[in-house]
Amino acid sequence: MVNSKASSFRFSFFIHNSAFIILFPPSFSRLLFIPAIGYLQDHLQSLSTSRLMSEERLVSGNIIDYPAPVYSYRRRVTREVPFGTIFLGGYLPIRVESMITAHTMDTAASVEQCRRLYEAGCEIIRLTVPTEKDAENLKNIREQLRRDGIDTPLVADIHFSAKAAMKAVEFVENIRINPGNYATGAKFSSKDYTDDEYRAELDKVREEFTPLVRKARSLGVSMRIGTNHGSLSDRIVSRYGNSPEGMVEAALEFSRICEDEGYYDQLFSMKSSNVRVMIQAYRLLVARADAELRYAYPLHLGVTEAGDGDEGRIKSAMGIGALLEDGLGDTIRVSLTEDPVNEVPVGFAIVKKYNDMLLVRGDRAHLPVKHVIEHERKSAGHVQLPFEPFSYSRRPSISIDGAGIPVGGDALPGVETAAHAPITDTESLRDEILARLDPGKPEDAIRSELVSVGVGSAEDISLLKALLDSLGNLREKIVVSTADTSIVPALLPLCGRVRLDIVEGETLGTGLIESLHDRNAAIEFCFIHEKSSENVPAEVLVRLAAKLKARGLQRVMLSIVSDAPLYSTRKLALELKKAGLDYPIAVRYRRLDGERSGVLIQSAIQAGTLFCDGIGDLIALETNMPASEEVSLCFNILQAARIRMSKTEFISCPGCGRTYFELEKTTALIKQRVSHLKGLKIGIMGCIVNGPGEMADADFGYVGSGKGRVSLYVGKECVEENIPEAEALERLIELIRQNGKWVDPV
């Protein structure tokens, strides 16, 4: 597709079935079909491969709106793509995928891991295929699995070898291609490409990639075009940087080749270890692909190198869930540095909510899926967003004293948790507050910075005074919450902040706003959202905020609390923006029942997505978790969103058949030795495939380079190559020392 922009209108045209099709703006209610001569068709296809073409798409206005809904759930309807015995996309359930870590040449071990994944319910199984020999052995693995009655679709994971891809496609249901590694030359050079050089390199890619496309089409095998943030080609990086724009363009280049060959069984992935980059890349891909490509192709979602334990689950849930909440995603993989079987239940826990919401909207099979999506987008009109979907910028807000810590402005988001003991049990409540604030810890330790205490009526005020007096200087860390409007004036002189809970269907007492002033505690208006629409909390809070602003009040915060605050808080941010109001927003998530894993996943999605969007000046969780775990969850969410670093960040891959050391054991050992280095980012990679590239997002890297061998990196630069694995950890620590990043553990 080519776009042209004139002063009065914009149009696009593309070649389809030997016709020259002009797409006019919505004001033009027709398509013009003009027969295309061979020269024009060849010329346009050549243009479509050039970087100049890509830039014209960008400047012509294709990227105007993010086409996904952000205030309610509606799934993006995509073309259904075959995966052997199943399909994905369309209105079908969101599928869960995993990947074995056994070497593909080890038939028995590979079959055993596939069997265990099958028994765990895994719907798609991926295997790494680094060489032609590995590709040939897929036949043996497949045959044994089918003899055992296991018909789970298999995916061949290809990075560098076109020959391996040509063989592997014969034995799998899907083949994954990494555009950054496939048919590319040297990596991480600083070469600047001229337009002619760029076009020539892209022509080479087309020449090497087209045979695979034709073979996959003839065999009925689908293809995932999977870009990784850490392994973009030099050609792409030279023009777009190591960025979401580069990730998207890399994938679209390969997709255009597929479409030119009449091959439409495609899907995309845009993976990164940086959750924000991953979210931005998928959103940008959807905006561009739905505008430029023939079909709306399915998406495979995942955060690569997410790590292990709670951190890995939180990062995966946040990145995947943020996109699922926007209606994007047809299959997912949770990449954990653990046994692959552990990924499966986490994946199903993430997609359950969305699969449960899946509604059949009628048979529209007679219409191309893209037409359905375009119709919905046009009928919906322009939707204002309170955030930048393709880049990060924090929502502007004023800075206030929010109870002993700054809230809003440029301040790092604070952490608040709620005490569960009642005010009537003063001794237990005091003990719980001290356990949460943990004043004996170092100043920068992970602990709750604020604790909220509930007060139900005027009779509780004397108990509150006694409690606050017993806390001494810590009283400024106490947030008092109440739903009783009448006692707010009495509470304001006592503590650092008062939170007034606004209950649906109830009215605020008269005279409250007139009684407020900035000399007392800050006040937070918190809407308890239960049954009303997503618009109601924002409407109520913005009306209140406008009145407070008119009175000149500064020490004001706003929030919405529920077990699903994402859509309503986005709406609040939008309405505040439209009204020119810049009070800080607290991100609140409350869920006091359910299993730990569900609470962890949903809080990461609901709260974490808002911080990735740049919305939120404080995080406050109320859960059934133990206090220490709840506090850790708050900090883990902020760190995964890259909004506040509170400990060492480990970027560790899940391993695959390319890995020649014990990744889980090694990761645990490295964590044990360096986890006290707050804010430092350390990459632990099984092999070179994503390793050096993802080092761009890490300060130091530990990357497998062969059997018993490891290479060490500073950023993307390899500084020690092929050193013995037994020496690697100590040499990594020494490298950290040499670069002035080491401090002795306390």
Curated annotation (Swiss-Prot):
| Enzymatic reactions | (2E)-4-hydroxy-3-methylbut-2-enyl diphosphate + oxidized [flavodoxin] + H2O + 2 H(+) = 2-C-methyl-D-erythritol 2,4-cyclic diphosphate + reduced [flavodoxin]
Keywords for the protein's UniProt record, in alphabetical order: 4Fe-4S, Iron, Iron-sulfur, Isoprene biosynthesis, Metal-binding, Oxidoreductase
**Pfam families named in the record:** GcpE
Q: Where is the signal peptide?
A: none
Q: Which InterPro entries match?
A: Dihydropteroate_synth-like_sf, IspG_atypical, IspG_bac-typ, NO2/SO3_Rdtase_4Fe4S_sf
Q: What domain of life does the native source organism fall in?
A: Bacteria
- What does the record list as GO biological process? isopentenyl diphosphate biosynthetic process, methylerythritol 4-phosphate pathway; terpenoid biosynthetic process
Q: What does the record give as EC number? A: 1.17.7.3
Give GO MF terms, alphabetically.
4 iron, 4 sulfur cluster binding; 4-hydroxy-3-methylbut-2-en-1-yl diphosphate synthase activity (ferredoxin); 4-hydroxy-3-methylbut-2-enyl-diphosphate synthase activity (flavodoxin); iron ion binding
Task of the protein = Converts 2C-methyl-D-erythritol 2,4-cyclodiphosphate (ME-2,4cPP) into 1-hydroxy-2-methyl-2-(E)-butenyl 4-diphosphate.
Q: What is this protein called?
A: 4-hydroxy-3-methylbut-2-en-1-yl diphosphate synthase (flavodoxin)
